């Protein structure tokens, strides 16, 4: 048994927040400090023609948060693998991830190439290590992101209070929730899956078509990184005008269109 297979065997099964509809399967993975409510605009449309399975990530929503979990990308993906395995799916499925969920989706597709027929990565926070970036302007931007993330991790009270205010102001509800209960999952996932990541190589390794959907106002997209993956033959990038990091109507419409073509729409 490989080390990853053993990790999957020991991983907890995550909360399945939605399992609705019939047809080809689409699995949804939300982002950091969030829940399956991220996809509230896309689930009603997708379930008309597909079986929709929305999984809540390790440590978030109603999923388990083991005390000994370090929230590495391998632990996250192992738990996703254990959950999908428990469903006994017979055919390859479309895997849709938002924010952190998109990074986990890319790693899942790289590890399980026979299971994923298509990847849709919405608002992926893809970063290279600053020392790997030649362009000084891009390197400066990415370094600023890393400092900001470090500040959030090191200032618990500020981060929890600010997140609550932002959530209320923008009416995000459970789409953004940083609390005492998920603080450990938030900080470790941020540090070990977003600040330190191999997403570009995971995307390169995946052997299925990949659609990257990103808003032009996304505050977590570093300049230059999308250009790198956009040059890969199996990647198509969709830029959504006047949308930020959140799955709002404009972004939701493009996600639906990448999956169901012109038939998809949101009223």
Which role does the model predict for each range below?
Residues 30-32, 97-102, 215:
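Conserved alpha/beta-hydrolase "nucleophile elbow" surrounding the catalytic nucleophile
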Residues 121, 130-132, 149-205:
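Conserved alpha/beta-hydrolase catalytic His-Asp/Glu region
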Residues 18-62:
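Conserved HGGG/HGGXW glycine-rich cap/lid loop of the alpha/beta-hydrolase fold
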Residues 54-96:
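Active-site loop/oxyanion-hole signature of alpha/beta-hydrolase fold enzymes
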Residues 1-27, 47-51, 77, 82-92, ...:
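Alpha/beta-hydrolase fold catalytic core
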Residues 110, 118-148:
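Flexible "cap/lid" loop of the alpha/beta hydrolase fold
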Residues 102-113, 119:
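Short glycine-enriched nucleophile-adjacent loop
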Residues 210-243, 249:
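Conserved loop-alpha-helix segment in the C-terminal half of the alpha/beta-hydrolase fold
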């Amino acid at each position: 048994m490989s080390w990853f297979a053993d990790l999957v065997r020991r991983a907890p099964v995550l909360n399945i927040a939605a399992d609705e509809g019939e047809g080809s399967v689409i699995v949804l993975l939300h982002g950091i400090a969030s829940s399956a409510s991220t996809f509230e605009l896309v689930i009603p449309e997708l379930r008309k023609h597909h079986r929709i399975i929305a999984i809540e990530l390790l440590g978030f929503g109603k999923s388990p948060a083991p005390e000994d979990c370090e929230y590495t990308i391998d632990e996250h993906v192992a738990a996703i693998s254990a959950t999908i395995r428990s469903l006994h799916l017979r055919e390859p499925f479309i895997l849709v991830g938002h924010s952190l969920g998109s990074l986990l989706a890319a790693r899942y597709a790289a590890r399980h190439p026979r299971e994923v027929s298509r990847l849709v990565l919405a608002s992926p926070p893809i970063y290279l290590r600053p020392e790997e970036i030649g362009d000084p302007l891009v390197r400066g931007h990415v370094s600023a992101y890393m400092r900001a993330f470090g500040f959030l991790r090191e200032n618990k009270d500020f981060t929890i209070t600010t997140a609550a205010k932002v959530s209320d102001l923008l009416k995000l509800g459970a789409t953004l929730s940083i609390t005492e209960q998920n603080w450990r999952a938030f900080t470790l996932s941020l540090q070990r899956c977003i600040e330190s990541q191999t997403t570009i190589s995971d995307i390169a390794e995946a052997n299925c078509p990949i659609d990257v959907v990103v808003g032009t106002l996304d505050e977590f997209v570093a300049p230059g990184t999308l250009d790198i993956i956009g040059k890969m033959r199996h990647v198509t990038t969709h830029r959504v005008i006047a949308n930020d990091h959140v799955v709002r109507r404009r972004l939701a419409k493009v996600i639906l269109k990448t999956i169901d073509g012109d038939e998809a729409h949101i009223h």
